[in-house]
Structures are given as C-alpha cells and as structure tokens.
Swiss-Prot record:
It is found in: Nucleus speckle. The modification N-acetylmethionine is found at residue 1. This is Zinc finger CCCH domain-containing protein 14. Keywords: Acetylation, Differentiation, Isopeptide bond, Metal-binding, Nucleus, Phosphoprotein, Repeat, RNA-binding, Spermatogenesis, Ubl conjugation, Zinc, Zinc-finger. RNA-binding protein involved in the biogenesis of circular RNAs (circRNAs), which are produced by back-splicing circularization of pre-mRNAs. Acts by binding to both exon-intron boundary and 3'-UTR of pre-mRNAs to promote circRNA biogenesis through dimerization and the association with the spliceosome. Required for spermatogenesis via involvement in circRNA biogenesis. Regulates the pre-mRNA processing of ATP5MC1; preventing its degradation. Also binds the poly(A) tail of mRNAs; controlling poly(A) length in neuronal cells. InterPro entries: Nab2/ZC3H14, Znf_CCCH. Residues 78-103, 131-145 have a biased composition (Polar residues). Homodimer; facilitating circular RNAs (circRNAs) formation. Associates with the spliceosome. Interacts with HOOK2. Interacts with ZFC3H1 in a RNase-sensitive manner. The gene is ZC3H14. The modification N6-acetyllysine is found at residue 357. Belongs to the ZC3H14 family.
Length: 736
C-alpha cells in the first residue's frame, strides 16, 4: 500500500510541476481532476477534450507528456505484475486433474493475461463448491491491487513458497487480523472443545470470513505451532521473490485441496474424523450468513496439503453445487470483493453528515409526533382557601347514618396542593367515605351542593390566588331520580345551571404527558354571556330536565356563573324549606335568552350570524308568491331579483341578496296655478311673448307647415312664402 501511495504522490507532484511549467497551475483542484481522469483510464483524446478549457493551446503538449509518463510506468511495472495473475485469470480457469498438465506454457498464458495496469474486478464472485473458488479462499498469493487515485497499481504478494518435506498432517489455517472483531457467537472451537483423544474437523468463524482449521491431536499441533510462526515471518520477507514457483505452488495446493472434496477422501475422513456439523444444510446456511458479514481482508498462512494415500484415479471437481451435499463439513468461501471507491474527488462527494443529520431529525420528529394522549384543558380560577366547616361535618355524619341502598355513588378523586395540608386531609377522608358507602343519591347530591357552595362563595371573593382546575371525569356526576321531592330537583337543576364550577377540584397530575396548558387567571370577574358556548346556554335553559351522566359531565369547567345565577343559587341554599320553585328558574331562563323574533332578518340571506341570529331566516318557499302582499318582509323564501342591488322598485316582491341603496323619489314639481281659461284668441298670437298671457294660444302642430292632414286640429302658421321665381338664384352678369 505504501509503494502505491508513493507512486501516486510522485505522479501528482509531476503533474503539478508540469502545470506550473506550462503556466496553467491555479490550485490543487486541477491536479486532482487530472488524477481522477488517470484513474478512470481516459484516453489521450478524451483528456485533450476535457483539459482544453483549462490548458488552452498547451493541452496536446500536456496530454502527450502525461501519457508518455504513464506508458513508462506500465513498462516498468510489467515485469513484477507478470509474476502473478489477477483474480479472474487465476481463479476462473479450469483446474487440471493432474499436476503434470500444468505446463510452463500455461504459466506464460497466465502472465500474458495480466494487464499492465489492473483495477480490482467488481464482478460478483461465485459462491459454489468448485475447486477454483476454494482455491480463491486460501490462495498462495494474497494479491492486493491498490489503485490510488488512478495513478499506479501495486501488485503485492505475500507468498508461502516453502514446502514441508513430509509433514505428518495437513493444516489449512486462515487467521483474522489482530484488530478484527471476533464473533463470539460463532466461535465454535473455543466454546465447544471436543475430546483430545479423537481428532475433529472444526469450522471456525472469524470476523471477516469463515476459515477452516483441521485440528490434529495435541502433540502434533504443538510441534507445528513453531513452524507456523517461522513461516509467517518468512512470508513478510518474500514479496517479489520466487515468482516462478508461485503458480506451480498454487496449482499444487489447489490440486491437493481439491482432493479433499473427492468422495474417496471424504469417506476416509468420515472414518477418521468426527465432523462438528452433522447437518450439511445448517452449515451452508451459516456460511451464507457469515459471508454477508465479511468486510475486511485477512492475513492467511498457506501450507502445502499432505497427499492422502489413494491409488485410485483422481477425478476433476464436479461443477454442480449439489455434489457437496452429504459431505464432510469443510468450508469453501470466497474473499470479499474490494470496496468500491468513488470516482469523484472528496470535495464533490455528498456530505455524510448532512444525511446522518437528516435521518436523526426525521427519527426525532417521528418520536415527537407520536404518543400524544389527550389531556383535558386546564383553567386557573381564583379560589380562596377553604376549611372544613361544621355544616360539612354534619353532612358527613348524616351520610354515615344513612341506610345502604342498591345505588352506589361513583368514587370521587381529589388531590389538593401540598401547602394546604388541612384541606388535603379533610378532603381525602370525605372522598374515601363517599367511595366506601353506598349513599342515597339525594344525600350525595346535598353533600355535593354544600361543598360546591363553598367553592362558589370562595370564587366570589376577590382572591387572586390560583389553583389549576381540570375538566371533571365522567364518574363525577350523580344521576337524579325523577321521583325525588321538589326541593331536591331544584338543587339538581341548580347544580346543572352552575355546572361550570361545581366540580371537584383536582391537582394537575405530574405523571401526565406534557400538553399545551392555557392558564387564565380570572380575578373574581365572571365571564360575559357572549363567551358561553351554545351547549352551555342550552344546558342552562333546559335545567328543569333530568340530566344524564354523560351529557352533564361533558360540560366541565367551561366558564363561570353569571351574577344573576350566583344570586339565585345563594337564595336557594339559604332557603331551608326548599320553597324556591322551578317556576322561578324557568322565568330566569326565559328572561336570559329571548326567543327568536318573528321578523325577517333584513340581512338574510347574507347574514353572518347564521343560526345565532335573533331574527327569522326563511327556509320554506312562499306559496302566495308573486301575489304575496308582504314583499320583502315575508317569512318565506321569495325568488331572487334579477336586478338585485340595482333594483329601484320599492315594493319589489323578489329577494335581493345584496343590500339595495334606497332611491329617494324625486320631489314632485309643483304645477303653477292654471290661469283662467279664456276662449278668446290672443291678438298677438303667435308673436305673443307674455308668459302669463291669459288669452288663448293654440297648440302648434309639430309638423308645422309640412302637415298634410286636412283635419288637423293643431295650429299651423300662415306664413307668406315668396314666389318660386323669387327663390331662384341667378348669376349676375359681369361686363366685359
């Protein structure tokens, strides 16, 4: 890697010097761009076309020089690169069945197939049980082809050319690099040690790729451990030596490794070794899973495989993948293909931080927008501190003495602020008492009324201390039986009327999820009638009807009582005999909200108040139209006027959507008093010029002298017209 980086750096510095010589060097981006073109194997013509914008007339001179340098580099690297083959040429070639078949001509053919400047192949490797793929896993030469910015290629091999003269047993040992992470879940050798008396074939999964270790008895393993260390040291020293032996060595190893998959060898192994995996399909599934995890290359030590003593004819490896089913648990794996480098310079690549930031923000937004639970809206009302009074204690004693009935009052929960310890203790005792006893609904209603009465009185005081109130739960309303006595019905109606405040106060639960809180501090000022919703108003005016639990509980703390309602409520509570009748309540309701007037809204159909308008909006068509005498004041629908706002007819029976501008009728002209008529013809007529002449002046005929009617009664002036000849013009004679 260091040699390739050094070559790339030298090429880049040479390009930079050449650009400075030509006077075209501006910054570091142009040499980087040229290095990218070199990495992409651009031809001289393509480079000339791309660099003409930057170099101008010196483009051809520069590209000729650059390609000359690259050709020299290729000629220098041809000799070392011919010593080894690329991954495709080495491992995709058919493996011969005999060692003698691999001749020097084949070696020369492999050398010729290696390009001088090679890029790692991005073709997906095959994952089958072929010997060629098996040899790719534990190959003799660890070809590391590094192309740094496309400048040069360094073909580096770590070779194990040594052969043992006669090793007692064979070891294929592929070990991960020391900085690789070891998958502890798949390390079967250390977690499942087998008996030392019996040699076992164990499949060990490392971090980057699966490897095979054929374990021997402990004696032979200890003897060979030092040999492995020596070979690993010798491997680092042999980088470019013994090139001629590499292909022969590799072919021999491939040949011997291929024999491991032959049926005769497998049968003998099954007799001698106990396989760790009995189920071959399970082993292959684990190989596939581990193949997806491979990312990094490994440092492998390759030792010649000992020949098994078989006199039978050696067979070529079968191409079918299914031929390995039922065989011993040997691993055939493919090294991970090199990671593809982007061709763009780092300055033009996408910023990974932006992508990661966008992903994290998207995840945060998803987690924030989900899991919202509905929390009732809270309102802060001024409440004076209250203490338990003698009346409240008396009511509690009455509740204790009540006989139990089948009706159960729902439990009421209350938590007061920590500062008001007296209120908390007393309220808790009372609520527990109500929840334990089966209370008669009338008594529970009376108790609730008395408690709420003090709430109301404390609200009347101008105390600005605020407690956060919450909408009551559905279980806090008490159903009133229709056959109770009139005093209790009045109390229930008052409870419904004042249902905005007469709910149990609750402290805000700290464990509830956060939600928008609208805290409004009302310093003893009741809300105006306009702020009440329609449902609340309807609730106020239908207070005489028995209220079911759900409808009453939905009202909640939506507003405050009107002053008139507070006065009415205090009168009812002060009346011990309950003589305050329902009739007075209904009178109050009617007085508060007048019914709709039986008068048509003058803004209809463009009225903005809609159903809230106090005037009548027509719905059904008028049956008397167009003879309806009410015109625009009719309570039924009339058709639209085609003139709409431009209509000037004051009593137009049609409907006008736009507002008409009232047209003032012109003031009638006062006719002058008629002079006394006289049948005597004015003597000065038609030349009379007196406007108030009392005499008769005949009316002129509009056709004047051209009138042809002999019986025309109008006046025709008698004008003496000159004769015809007098109207003829003659040119005067001029004397010559």
């Amino acid at each position: 890697m260091e040699i390739g980086t050094e070559i790339s750096r030298k090429i880049r510095s040479a390009i930079k010097g050449k650009l400075q010589e030509l006077g075209a060097y501006v910054d570091e981006e142009l040499p980087d761009y040229i290095m990218v073109m070199v990495a992409n194997k651009k031809s001289q013509d393509q480079m000339t076309e791309d660099l003409s914008l930057f170099l101008g007339n010196n483009t051809i001179r520069f590209t000729v020089w650059l390609h000359g340098v690259l050709d020299k580099l290729r000629s220098v690297t041809t000799e070392p690169s011919s010593l080894k083959s690329s991954d495709t040429n080495i491992f995709d070639s058919n493996v011969p069945s005999n060692k003698s078949n691999f001749s020097r001509g084949d070696e020369r053919r492999h050398e010729a197939a290696v390009p001088p400047l090679a890029i790692p192949s991005t073709r997906p490797e095959k994952r089958d049980s072929r010997v060629s793929t098996s040899s790719q896993e534990s190959k003799t030469t660890n070809v590391r082809q590094t192309y740094d910015d496309g400048a040069a290629t360094r073909l580096m091999s770590t070779v194990k050319p040594l052969r043992e003269p006669a090793p007692s047993e064979d070891v294929i040992d592929i070990k991960p690099e020391p900085d690789d992470l070891i998958d502890e879940d798949l390390n079967f050798v250390q977690e499942n040690p087998l008996s030392q008396k019996k040699p076992t074939v164990t499949l060990t999964y490392g971090s980057s790729r699966p490897s095979i270790e054929i374990y021997r008895p402990p004696a032979s393993r200890n003897a060979d451990s030092g040999v492995h260390l020596n070979r690993l040291q010798f491997q680092q020293q042999q980088n470019s030596i013994h090139a001629a032996k590499q292909l022969d060595m590799q072919n021999s190893w491939v040949y011997e490794t291929g024999r491991l998959c032959e049926p005769e060898v497998l049968n003998s192994l099954e007799e001698t070794y106990s396989p760790f995996f009995r189920n071959n399909s399970e082993k292959m599934s684990m190989e596939d899973e581990n193949f997806r995890k491979r990312k990094l290359p490994v440092v492998s030590s390759v030792v010649k495989v000992k020949k098994f003593n078989h006199d039978g004819e050696e067979e070529e490896e079968d191409d079918d993948y299914g031929s390995r089913t039922g065989s011993i648990s040997s691993s055939v794996s493919v090294p991970a293909k090199p990671e593809r480098r982007p061709s763009l310079p780092p300055s033009k690549q996408a910023n990974k931080n932006l992508i990661l930031k966008a992903i994290s923000e998207a995840q945060e937004s998803v987690t924030k927008t989900t899991n919202y639970s509905t929390v009732p809206q809270k309102q802060t009302l001024p409440v004076a501190p209250r203490t338990r009074t003698s009346q409240e204690e008396l009511l509690a004693e009455v509740v204790q003495g009540q006989s139990r009935t089948p009706r159960i009052s729902p439990p009421i929960k209350e938590e007061e602020t920590k500062g008001d310890s007296v209120e908390k203790n007393q309220g808790t005792q009372q609520r527990q008492l109500l929840s334990r006893l089966q209370i008669d609904p009338v008594m529970a209603e009376t108790l609730q009324m008395s408690q709420d009465y003090y709430d109301m009185e404390s609200m009347v005081h101008a105390d600005t201390r605020s407690f956060i109130l919450k909408k009551p739960k559905l279980s806090e309303e008490i159903v009133v039986a229709p056959n109770q006595e009139s005093g209790m019905k009045t109390a229930d109606s008052l409870r419904v009327l004042s249902g905005h405040l007469m709910q149990t106060r609750d402290l805000v639960q700290p464990d509830k999820p956060a939600s928008p809180k609208f805290i409004v501090t009302l310093d003893g000022v009741p809300s105006p009638p306009g702020y009440m919703s329609d449902q609340e108003e309807d609730m106020c005016f239908e207070g005489m009807k028995p209220v079911n639990q759900t409808a009453a509980s939905n009202k909640g703390l939506r507003g405050l009582l009107h002053p008139q309602q507070l006065h009415l409520l205090s009168r009812q509570l002060e009346d011990p005999n309950g003589s305050f009748s329902n009739a007075e309540m209904s009178e109050l309701s009617v007085a508060q909200k007048p019914e709709k007037l039986l008068e048509r809204c003058k803004y209809w159909p463009a009225c903005k108040n809609g159903d809230e308008c106090a005037y009548h909006h027509p719905i059904s068509p008028c049956k008397a139209f167009p003879n309806c005498k009410f015109a625009e004041k009719c309570l039924f629908v009339h058709p639209n006027c085609k003139y709409d706002a431009k209509c000037t007819k004051p009593d137009c029976p049609f409907t006008h959507v736009s507002r008409r501008i009232p047209v003032l009728s012109p003031k009638p002209a006062v006719a002058p008093p008629a002079p006394p008529s006289s049948s005597q013809l004015c003597r000065y007529f038609p030349a009379c010029k007196k406007m108030e002449c009392p005499f008769y002046h005949p009316k002129h005929c509009r056709f004047n002298t051209q009138c042809t009617r002999p019986d025309c009664t109008f006046y025709h002036p008698t004008i003496n017209v000159p004769p015809r000849h007098a109207l003829k013009w003659i040119r005067p004679q001029t004397s010559e």
